[in-house]
Regions:
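Membrane-interface helix caps and helix-loop-helix hairpins in membrane proteins
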Residues: 91-96, 143-152, 173, 205-210
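Juxtamembrane C-cap of transmembrane helices in multi-pass membrane transport proteins
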Residues: 19-34, 47, 86-96, 104, ...
Length: 218
């Protein structure tokens, strides 16, 4: 059973990484079609929230809504944590290549381990430390190549990684109190709400633009 769980865990991490690496490609197409970061993320998270609500509603098994306090915590995880990480990341890929952005972004496990060690006293194993050092060397080499990265882009990606770290550490505790579908539904709803509020409240000097052509929506 343990081996099956580990295999499933590796598979899910791989699929998550694959999906995250593909997102910038679609975003670039939207940018080329006239959209900006917030316009892309409004569409992305609104669709995600609706889909997760439908999946939760029609998936097998009885699912109960969590207590109001937990609902609020999950909503804030999306409205502050996940939306913040996405905003920094998708803004970064407007300033440098998507490939470099992805590589640098994956330094976030280093932040997770270090902050988890400092805050939750979770001491990493030797294998983990070795893997993280290797990852940091790879990121440094990639970011240091001439013309590959910009200072602004690197800072934005690192901010995204750091924000996602706090989201991961906070979410690991909140998600234990509810089922996965319910938790993700509230997180996506929180993220979508944050960007809709930005659109409604943003000054005219920072307009939100959506794709102007069909290719940007596909």
């Amino acid at each position: 059973m343990l081996k099956n769980q580990r295999a499933l865990g590796f598979a899910l991490v791989f699929l998550s990484s694959l999906g995250f690496s593909m997102a910038p490609t679609f975003s670039k197409r939207a940018y080329e079609s006239g959209a900006n970061t917030v316009g892309v993320l409004i569409v992305r998270f609104t669709i995600a929230a609706v889909l997760m609500l439908l999946i939760r509603q029609f998936s097998s098994g009885q699912r109960v809504w969590p207590k109001p306090r937990l609902m609020f915590d999950l909503f804030l995880l999306g409205a502050i944590g996940y939306s913040g990480a996405a905003f920094f990341y998708f803004t970064a890929i407007e300033n440098m290549s998507t490939g470099v952005s992805i590589v640098i972004w994956y330094i976030y496990p280093v932040f997770v381990v270090l902050i988890g060690w400092a805050v939750f006293k979770t001491k990493p194993k030797r294998q983990t430390i070795f893997s993280l050092i290797s990852a940091m060397i790879g990121v440094a080499i990639t970011a240091g190549q001439p013309g590959n990265a910009t200072t602004k882009g690197v800072i934005l990606v690192l901010l995204s990684s750091l924000t996602y770290t706090f989201y991961t550490l906070s979410g690991s505790r909140a998600f234990k109190k509810t089922d996965l579908y319910t938790g993700v539904t509230f997180v996506m709803t929180g993220a979508a709400t944050a960007f809709w509020l930005y659109w409604l409240l943003a000054p005219s000097s920072t307009p939100v633009t959506f794709p102007q052509h069909t290719s940007g929506w596909v």
